[in-house]
């Protein structure tokens, strides 16, 4: 699963159900006949934690990682990220007063403006 081209793309990147969906999973599972459902769940949790940890490490690491979304509610994903990122405090955004459920609305404008240099406004043409 980790050989999917998405994981080789450079940051910043984002994705969701438009790419990682039942069709994607079916293609992956066809390569591994007879896999048990609990092994699928464990593999997806590990894939999530590993891909996040790798990107954090490629960016130079961090002292604290704030997690939101479905992964923040998954104890296995949170535990694995903590293990894969020694020295990094892995927390949920809710612990800092920002509801993980509201993050998508807050994230989208930030994603649009992230590439803008400080003190420089870029106007659409």
Swiss-Prot record:
Biological process annotations from GO: amino sugar metabolic process; peptidoglycan turnover
Pfam family, one: AnmK
Record-linked InterPro entries: Anhydro_N_Ac-Mur_kinase, ATPase_NBD
GO molecular function: ATP binding; phosphotransferase activity, alcohol group as acceptor
Domain of life: Bacteria
PANTHER family per UniProt: ANHYDRO-N-ACETYLMURAMIC ACID KINASE (PTHR30605:SF0)
The family this protein is said to belong to: Belongs to the anhydro-N-acetylmuramic acid kinase family.
The protein, known as: Uncharacterized anhydro-N-acetylmuramic acid kinase-like protein
